[in-house]
Amino acid sequence: MIAFRTLDDAVDLADKRVLVRVDLNVPMESGRVTDATRLKAILPTIRDITGKGGKAVLLAHLGRPKGRDESQSLAPVAKALEGELGRKVAFASDCIGDEAKSAVSRLASGEVIVLENTRFHAGEEKNAPDFIEALASLGDIYVNDAFSTAHRAHASTEGLARKLPAYAGRSMESEIEALTKALEAPQRPVLAVVGGSKVSSKLELLGNLVKKVDILVIGGGMANTFLAALGKKVGKSLCEHDLANTARDILKKAEAAGCEIVLPVDAVVATEFKANAAHRVTSVDDVKDDEMMLDAGPETVGIVKQKLDGAKTVVWNGPFGAFEMTPFDAATVAVARYVGDLTHKGRLLSVAGGGDTVAALNHAGTAERFSYVSTAGGAFLEWLEGKALPGVEALRR
């Protein structure tokens, strides 16, 4: 387990200015927040700090602005947070300088303020010492509650943790604990589901997982690359033929590590890539030249369920097929619901993450039944790849 200080260790917060790095990078439409999931995730940390009499000074980014860009201001996000928190949230139109200092100095014990987008300043992504100093002058201690940005060594995610007494927030703490239970010290057997379209985007992930898990189920477009590498005809299916040798190398590594690989044995195929296209279920040995595999078939789903029955831990990243279109969502939905049911019965610890994965589990209506669903995206993937995350490393005792 990673040793780091949590808010349990931060006992004396009365009247302290607590700089909290949070994830406010939420989807927006016409100046309104359209999904408040990330806002809800930080409420326990804010309430913990304010409940102890601390002044919560929130730091965050929104989008990828190149300098100041009012369309990516955090002002409307602060307003939405106010609604979620059920109390007033102040806002400062800058995150450093006189405006920020003045706004923070006006805070009373137990109050909350959102400072403007840290990425309006180039020093944020450069982890620049002068920018770190300017931020640090606004706080007495630092809390990181944004695991989703922990793979970036930026001023507000890494630099500040080395400048001020640093603690993990509640969301950060639960994310690290869930991932550690799933991969670093898991109950075995561990089964990983890795799907999605391309092997090329998940090479390091696959290479790391074959050393850590007992069973690796490969789905989605990337399964086609493995099937083609094994000599199967994949027709017009999405497939990275140039990675055939790489796919075979991963299979060899898995064999050497004692990791069982599960690939589709049947598929739902169509000649057109569109919702409700005419389709059929066929063996992966019988895909015609004008057909594309768009989902795993029912026999494959049955095999995966059988493997899940014997597993104790599941790590999931990526869908089985083109889940955004019916009927090519069937395998993803069936397996996701099965994992959710086993988890609900206490037979499985299940951790899932990555943008498409979260969307797929929500589509299946089963995200709530998983042990832990990470919204972290890039940081979740890098953790699965076995990489050290700067934002987490900086919190180590």
Swiss-Prot record:
Functional pathway: Carbohydrate degradation; glycolysis; pyruvate from D-glyceraldehyde 3-phosphate: step 2/5
GO annotation (BP), single: gluconeogenesis
CC terms in the record's Gene Ontology section: cytosol
Keywords: ATP-binding, Cytoplasm, Glycolysis, Kinase, Nucleotide-binding, Transferase
Keyword Aminoacyl-tRNA synthetase: no
GO molecular function: ADP binding; ATP binding; phosphoglycerate kinase activity
Subunit: Monomer.
UniProt name for this protein: Phosphoglycerate kinase
Gene name linked to the record: pgk
